[in-house]
A protein has these predicted regions:
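Pepsin/retropepsin-fold aspartyl endopeptidases
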Residues: 19-418
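N-terminal secretory signal peptides that target proteins for export/translocation
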Residues: 1-4
Length: 418
């Protein structure tokens, strides 16, 4: 009998060890912001921790599931580090959707857990200003089709014509002080001063303003938040009045799905669509839009930034392209252009890097691998993919309802018509 009793732990122990290993894998992917891997792991383990279920829901634009799941976890008073991360994600979800008061509530809840959190303390003055405005809302037509002007969208902002770039790498829409006044917007200064950082890590001072109305075709958004920067800021300083701005992630997400073509047609479509989580190849990492691209045999996450004129690869990419770097890489000093000015970085120049992105092969020719990490996203992601890569396609679709990126070349479009 005692021998049989001693045998019981031998049967149970591997099962317990397997469960611990599974949780360890999920935690590793979560800590490394690897949402595509975490999604795939959860599909194999449907009874996993609610925290990871909620995290994946947040990342793949399932806001209701994200919030409901996290509220269940918060109700049992999790560890402070877990509670902080949930409030951080919930604040990002709210800000992406233009729910300003809810974003402030989550920031304040985070600061109750950790009053010294520098990111929350830094972003609170901005969000506090926005919380006094009604939430962003969308109305009007479900679809719009417009002709772009050299990549800029024809808009009406508070009834006045504007022509703005669209920038998936911008946490919030941004415009110059002169354009804000042109549109009759009241500029407010956050307490303690507003400071943000551009793609190069340069500090940029800003005010805050909210447009009562922003119209694209027949689609109207109300209460759209803008950061307001000085008239001397790049790239606005050399632009004409009415063109000194860009449309950021909360507006683009509200469009539902957006498609643009090489001949300048831009379409937005808010119609309902059925999503398939396993097929999603874009996700959110807080206020970053992330896409998965393949290099050789590696599936890698990158920041997707339609506002970047040129793509840059980050230090992590050098690790997976080690052979290519050794064979054909040369040293260079590479200039990165940001709103706060130009900055030079030590980099490795490669003649060509081919990525499979959104179902199509596209080449960075040449490719620049920065040797130093510019911002926190460089810890988790392999580069910043810009419009130079996307414009190699005949048409591009970013669909926030299905969380997919699709690139089509001329052959693909002809085949679709057939």
């Amino acid at each position: 009998m005692r021998v049989q009793g001693l045998g019981l732990p031998i049967l149970v122990f591997p099962i317990a060890l397997s469960a611990l290993a599974a949780q360890s894998e999920l935690r590793k992917q979560s800590d490394a912001h690897q949402m595509f891997l975490l999604r795939d792991a959860l599909s194999r383990r449907p009874r996993s921790s609610d925290f990871y279920v909620g995290e994946v829901a947040c990342a793949f634009n399932k806001s209701s599931t994200c919030e409901e799941t996290f509220q269940k976890v918060l109700a049992v008073e999790p560890k402070p580090s877990v509670a902080k991360r949930m409030h951080e994600m919930l604040a990002a979800v709210a800000l992406r959707e233009g729910r300003y008061r809810r974003a402030l509530q989550e920031i304040d809840a985070l600061l109750l857990v950790d009053p010294n959190d520098s990111d929350a303390k830094g972003s609170r003055p901005l969000i506090e200003v926005l919380s006094h405005f009604p939430d962003q809302a969308v109305q009007g037509a479900s679809k719009a089709s417009v002709q772009m002007d050299d990549g800029k969208l024809p808009l009406l902002i508070n009834g006045t014509r504007a022509s703005y770039f669209f920038d998936s790498g911008a946490n919030l829409s941004t415009l110059s002080e002169s354009d804000a006044l042109r549109f009759g917007m009241e500029i407010q200064e956050p307490k303690s001063g507003g400071v943000s950082t551009d793609i190069s890590g340069n500090r940029v001072s800003f005010g805050v303003a909210v447009a009562k109305s922003l119209v694209l075709g027949g689609i109207e958004l109300r209460n759209v938040a803008f950061l307001v920067v000085g008239n001397e800021q790049q790239p606005f300083v050399d632009m004409e009045p009415g063109q000194r701005g860009l449309i950021g992630l909360p507006v683009l997400r509200a469009f539902g799905s957006m498609t643009w073509t090489r001949d300048g047609v831009f379409e937005a479509d808010r119609s309902p669509a059925t999503s398939n989580l396993s097929a999603a190849n874009i996700c959110f990492d807080d206020l970053y839009l992330i896409t998965q691209a393949s290099f050789e045999r590696h599936a890698l996450p990158f920041v997707l930034d339609t506002g970047a004129a040129t793509s840059e690869l980050w230090p992590k990419f050098a690790g997976v392209a080690r052979d290519l770097v050794r064979k054909s890489g040369t040293h260079e000093s590479h200039t990165v252009i940001g709103m706060g000015g130009n900055q030079k970085f030590e980099a490795t120049l490669l003649p060509k890097v081919v990525l499979n992105l959104g179902g199509m092969s596209a080449a960075l020719q040449p490719a620049h691998i920065l040797k130093t990490q510019q911002r926190d996203a460089g810890k988790w992601f392999y580069g910043n993919l810009g419009i130079d890569l996307l414009r190699q396609a005949q048409s591009v679709t970013i669909n926030f309802k299905t969380m997919t990126l699709q690139l089509y070349n001329a052959i693909d479009r002809r085949m679709r018509r057939e």
